[in-house]
Structures are given as C-alpha cells and as structure tokens.
Amino acid sequence: MADVPRDAKSALTALYWAAVHAVAPGASLRAALERVPMQERGRRVWVIAIGKAAHPMAQTALAVLAEWNRTPAGGIIVAPNEEAAPHPAVEVRAGDHPVPGPRSLEAAERIGLVAGRVREGDEVWVLLSGGATSLAAAPEGTVRPDELFQLYDRLLGSGLDITQMNLIRKRFSRWGAGRLAVALAPARVRNYIVSDVIGDDLAAIGSGPCVPDPSTAAHIHQMLDSAGLWNELPLSMKRSVSGAERDPSLETPKAGDAAFAHVERRIIASNRVALEAIEARARTFGYEPRVLGAALAGEAAIVGRRLIATLRSYCDQDASSLSGRTGRTCLIWGGETTVTLGAAHGRGGRCQELALSAARELAETAGLSTAALLAAGTDGRDGDTDAAGAIVTRDTWRTIQHAGRDPSRDLASHDSYPSLDAAGALLRTDLTATNVMDVVIAVCGPPADDKRARLTPAVALEAIAGSLRRLKE
C-alpha cells in the first residue's frame, strides 16, 4: 500500500489526484467501447474529439480501432493545445479557452469540413469533454464572430450558473443545440461524454452538439433579461431570439427531429465518480469521509463561508462521538460555483475565491486549528491562471497579511490569486486532460499515523465495493 501522507495538505493533494485518476478519459472511453457488440464493429468510423480531454480520448479511440483491425475514415481533434496527430487521417487543431478566439473559429470550420465528408452508413464517434463550447466556437446564422465572443465574455462575469450560460451560448453557436447531429445525419453517431456540468445534463455538456435543445427562445430571452444582458445584445442576436419566439420553425433542433434517431449517448466519466474515488481513498488515510453532494453552486465567496460552518459542525460531532469514529472528519463536495465580477477585478478563479473566503473563516472560527480545505478544478486550471485551485488552513489568512497583502481587499475585488500565491497556498498541477467540474475537500486533522486506523477490513471492503460499482456503470 502507498505511504500515507503525514499532514493534511499532503493528504488533500493526494485525494485530489485520486479524483483526477478516477475520471481518466482514456480508460473510461476504452471501457465504454468494449461494450460495442461485435456485429456493430464493421462500419466505416470517423472520430471527432472536442474538449480538454480530446487528445487522450482520440488516442484511445484510435487504439481500439486498431485492435479491431480498422482504420479511421478520418476525423479531427480540437483541444486547448496542439499535439502530434495520432493518425494521418485525423487532423489536430487547438482552440481558444476559456474565451473563444480566432483559433476556435478555425477549429469550428474544420469540424464542418469533416462532417461534410461523412456519408450514410458511416459511424461517427463524437468524443466530448469540458471546454468544447469555447474551443470550437463559431456563430450561427447572421451573428458575427466578434458578437459571439463578446457575449461569451459577458456571460463569464454575469453571475449566471454554468447551465444557464450553456443554454444561452449554444443558442448562437454553430455546433451547439444538436446542430452537429443534424450535420452528421443520417450517419450513426456514438456520443461519448466526460461530464463537466451539475446533474450530468446531456443538453448542457459542451453545448449539447448531439442532443436536442430543451430550451425555447422565450426562455433564453427571459434569462438574458434577468441578467441585465438583453439590452446589451447586438441586433443580430435579438433578431435570432425574437424571430424564433414568433416562428417555431426557426427554433433550435428539438426532440423528435429525425437527426437524433441514430444518435447514442453515454456519459463515461463524471463528478460523482471523482467524489467516490476521494471517499474511498480518504478511508485509507484514516478519515471519516462524507460526500455531501455533487451540486455545489452559488457565489464562490459565500459558498466558502458556508462550507467552513458545515465543517465546524461535523468536526464537533465527530470529536465528541462515542461510536468509534476517529475524529478525523473529511467532507467532500463537487460542482461548480460562480463569481459575479464588477467593472474592475483582479486575477483568480472561482476555486481560488472560494478558498480565500474559507481561509478567512478558518482564521476566525474557534475549534478548527487542524482543519484544511482544498478547492480545485479537475482540469488543472482555475480561471485564467496557472493554478488548479488552492489549499488553505487556519494560518493562511495571517500568512497573507504578513506578506504585505490585504486579503480582505483582494477577496472583495476578486483578486484571490496574489493573496494565495503570497501564502504558498496555490495548487499547481498543470493540465490534467480531463474535466468533471470542481472538487472541494475539507478535513479536520492530519491523516492517521496508525496503520490500523487507516485500513480496517470494513474500510477495504468499502473501497472495493466502490470500485466495483464504478466498473459496472
């Protein structure tokens, strides 16, 4: 068995990596492709991979095809970074993220060229992961690229949650709202998905390129209006929405469209799987883990305060329990918070803002002297920074102050990165090639230093059972 970390920070880092490894896109896709019946493995196959996990997913898909003695008919990989093409028939394009740009436009155009070569009787593997919306962004209809990109930028600071943002973005996107499935029809489509949205809503993941759009123009109008964005929209977007409100034939593709009759969709990795992996690993460290949900949402700073209050409550319960608990509490959440930006803001991401807010609460809350919290994106990037998130303790807030920064001011101005960097609290992992939203882990105390507390038969059986559940899904 691997060595158990000696302190809470090291334990949290190990738990983060347990989550990331559990949702490795390549292994997850291989498990899904192995379920394809032998009699269905004879079609001509195209590979379209879009998202942060596009490279490992495409590489696995091509490896499986080779094992089936098949050669890909063609395809494209659209990812945040360019790598060598894994096969001569498959091209590679780098898109822009988190805000789309010229490379995104080019990638979207190349997807169209690949889709135009697909014929009836062919099969297309659409491999989708987080970031797809931005990486392959191009406008639909009369909307100009600069108008689409400005909308994306405004949405990031609007306070709308990720599901609402996706509903709006795909309305104006060339490949969103089921339009890729329409372009590929009548070919058979196998859509394999690494979910990066709360609730694993297929229509929201990557703007739902192969899924009917459940929203209506009236719904989009209402959301834009409530966020104060409707009056800022360019005329082309207003006309698109208003026209569909008046004439249903101008709506986005809906359920019942013939294009979706030959589409099969499967989520192969999700935040829930990542949280289960954290839970299983935490038990081997001697913690009493509890998964408190995969739907964490709301303003990051407010959520950070709330989670520390929850941690205090559980730590008190476990410390006073007579039921044989170790007193080493581990609380686990998944999801994606938001940050509503003002006119002027600094550097950081939602996980860093949550962590900085939590650091203040830890410093001001009695009874949490050994507590620590990690908030990080499973993709290895939090906002437009080089950090995945941060790990904070009771001492983080004072360390920032001693370094000459005002953490209260930084928190209020959404400038969490410099404060956390000054305290050495940032978690830098580089890109992980997966994305199942964020994970937040809070612990009371370091891991157990007693091997018996770390891995009892009950703990081992629970970990094995969790692994078996994931394999069966």
Q: What is the predicted function of each stretch?
A:
Residues 48-49, 76-79, 125-130, 191-197, ...:
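Short beta-strand segments
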Residues 143-160, 213-228, 344-373:
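Gly/Ser/Thr-rich active-site loops/lids in small-molecule metabolic enzymes
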Residues 356-472:
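Internal helix-turn-beta structural module
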Residues 1-48, 56-57:
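An N-terminal, well-structured beta->alpha segment
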Residues 60-70, 89-91, 139-150, 184-186, ...:
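A glycine- and small-aliphatic-rich helix-loop capping segment at beta-alpha/alpha-beta transitions
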Residues 187-190, 212-306, 310:
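Accessory alpha-helical/coil subdomains and C-terminal extensions
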Residues 78-120, 169:
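Glycine-rich oxoanion-binding loops at beta->alpha junctions
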Residues 112-204, 209-212, 412-415, 419, ...:
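Glycine-rich, mobile lid/loop segments that gate access to catalytic sites or pores
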